[in-house]
């Protein structure tokens, strides 16, 4: 019997002659968690698609051994039957089906040729209880539950398939801190029961906490596999990016000028409960060249606030917005962009990209009028602009005409940034600009933010990562329960002070 539950040997994969994977090795023991680390586009997800059968045997080179025997899977059904289950970053849920129906999708219990819903609900409830998940009603549609709860339902679905190896791709990217803790504790329990795990995350503190071994890949090549006990987070970062990063936040001096943008008495109401305010009488000013961070707990109203300023909040709103001292009316994103206000949305996949369109066209769609003459697009001029943006933002793509959905999350995010920078905004709103982005891409995005500030662009940034808010902001607004709880200059500002303001403890305001 092999020492390893899984061995991937010398795995290679090409797309249109471009090597995505080149000689990758990965080994996992039963009861072991292997952290798989690498920058966006390094090949992590491609490797997991090979392992999980998304790319069937014969479409890649190398060998996979499972429980000591070579595995030649022709699809996902084969790998799941063997006990290899992947949980994708984008959850594979059918929102209007019940929790139980999602857990048993494709393997529904039947009686007399009909689905036995009583048996299915009972087995689903029993499964969740076994996983110590006691606050989910299996008869309710999945859309009733938060992203964190849906992640747990996906895990229950995997356990129902008798998973021996669980592949988790960025499982906490959209979870709250408490939901993340529940998930990590659950994975630790699985390890004690002998289940193996491959954990892919850009949150290296999570990797360090639950991984026994770390494998790093870069540009499709295997860089190192080492016990986590021998590594520090800076060690992993250095192996990922190929260079030492002494300062993740490359602060650069920039001048802060006069007030550029002002929001007065902004209030927004919940879409599903029109009597409930989600933003309650918030006012603030933003100066030319200033980076203003917005901090707060998940659900505090930060995204609702910035969405209303860009004209995309679907519920009722009221208040006044001023740009360069003049009141402006913003009812739609078109109004905002015409006034010089652009926004990078929180949900890149849903609101930021057109997935089947090329990378380049996703960048230039905001400024097509620049390349239009008598109703026709000057494709040569557009291509010059696309190539310039790809170089400026270091977007990794084999061809600007590839569908943007084929790019890694970090490179998609850079394309979204480009789309919102091309109109030359006076005010740039960034809602979770580095969510799902690796440490190297984060560094490049931070440098870009500072470069824009030096050019006089006013930046309003929402982030759930406190070190990020404190690392790049000139000033920090704190939102709690829809209200402005603090306005602090970022001078000796601590996470503790920001958190105290967010949860409503006394804090001194300083504009």
From Swiss-Prot:
It holds the Pfam family ABC_tran. Its EC number is 7.5.2.10. GO terms for molecular function: ABC-type D-xylose transporter activity; ATP binding; ATP hydrolysis activity. The keyword Membrane applies. The keyword rRNA-binding does not apply. Belongs to the ABC transporter superfamily. Xylose importer (TC 3.A.1.2.4) family. This is Xylose import ATP-binding protein XylG. It comes from Brucella melitensis biotype 1 (strain ATCC 23456 / CCUG 17765 / NCTC 10094 / 16M). The lineage of its organism: Bacteria, Pseudomonadati, Pseudomonadota, Alphaproteobacteria, Hyphomicrobiales. The gene is xylG.
């Amino acid at each position: 019997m092999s020492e390893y539950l899984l061995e991937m040997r010398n795995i290679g994969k090409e797309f249109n002659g471009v090597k995505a994977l080149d000689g990758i090795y990965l080994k996992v023991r039963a009861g072991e968690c292997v952290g798989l680390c690498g920058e966006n586009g390094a090949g992590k997800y491609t490797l997991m698609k090979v392992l999980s059968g998304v790319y069937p045997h014969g479409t890649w080179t190398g060998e996979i051994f499972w429980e000591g025997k070579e595995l030649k899977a022709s699809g996902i059904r084969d790998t799941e039957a063997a006990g290899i289950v992947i949980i994708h970053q984008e959850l594979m849920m059918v929102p209007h089906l019940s929790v139980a129906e999602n857990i048993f999708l494709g393997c529904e219990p039947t009686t007399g040729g009909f689905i036995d819903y009583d048996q299915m609900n009972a087995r689903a409830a029993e499964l969740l209880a076994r996983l110590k998940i006691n606050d989910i009603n299996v008869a309710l549609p999945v859309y009733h539950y938060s992203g964190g709860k849906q992640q747990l339902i996906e895990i229950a679905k995997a356990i129902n398939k008798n998973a021996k190896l669980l592949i988790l791709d960025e499982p906490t990217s959209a979870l709250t801190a408490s939901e993340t803790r529940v998930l990590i504790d659950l994975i630790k329990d699985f390890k004690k029961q002998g289940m193996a795990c491959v954990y892919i995350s850009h949150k290296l503190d999570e990797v360090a906490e639950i991984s026994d071994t770390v494998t790093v890949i870069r540009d499709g090549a295997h860089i190192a596999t080492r016990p986590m006990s021998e590594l520090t987070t800076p060690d992993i970062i250095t192996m990922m990016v190929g260079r030492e990063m002494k300062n993740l936040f490359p602060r650069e001096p920039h001048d802060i000028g006069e007030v550029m943008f002002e929001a007065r008495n902004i209030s927004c109401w919940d879409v599903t409960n029109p009597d409930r305010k989600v933003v309650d009488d918030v006012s603030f000013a933003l100066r030319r060249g200033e980076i203003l961070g917005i901090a707060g707990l998940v659900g505090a109203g930060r995204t609702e606030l910035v969405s209303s300023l860009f004209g995309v909040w679907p519920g009722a709103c009221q208040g006044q917005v001023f740009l360069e001292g003049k009141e402006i009316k913003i009812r739609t994103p078109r109004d905002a962009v015409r006034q010089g206000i652009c926004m990078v949305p929180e949900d890149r996949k849903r609101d930021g990209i057109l997935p089947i369109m090329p990378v380049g066209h996703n960048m230039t769609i905001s400024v097509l009028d620049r390349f239009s003459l008598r109703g026709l697009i000057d494709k040569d001029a557009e291509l010059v602009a696309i190539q310039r943006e790809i170089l400026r933002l270091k977007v990794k793509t084999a061809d600007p005409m590839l569908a943007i959905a084929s790019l890694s999350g970090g490179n998609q995010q850079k394309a979204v940034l480009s789309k919102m920078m091309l109109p030359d905004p006076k005010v740039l709103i960034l809602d979770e600009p580095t969510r799902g982005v690796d440490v190297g891409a984060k560094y490049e995005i931070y440098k870009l933010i500072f470069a824009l500030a030096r050019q006089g662009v006013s930046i309003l940034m929402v982030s759930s990562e406190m070190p990020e808010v404190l690392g790049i902001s000139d000033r920090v607004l704190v939102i709690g329960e829809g209200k402005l709880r603090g306005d602090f200059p970022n001078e000796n500002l601590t996470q503790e002070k920001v958190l105290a303001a967010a949860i409503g403890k006394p804090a001194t305001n300083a504009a």
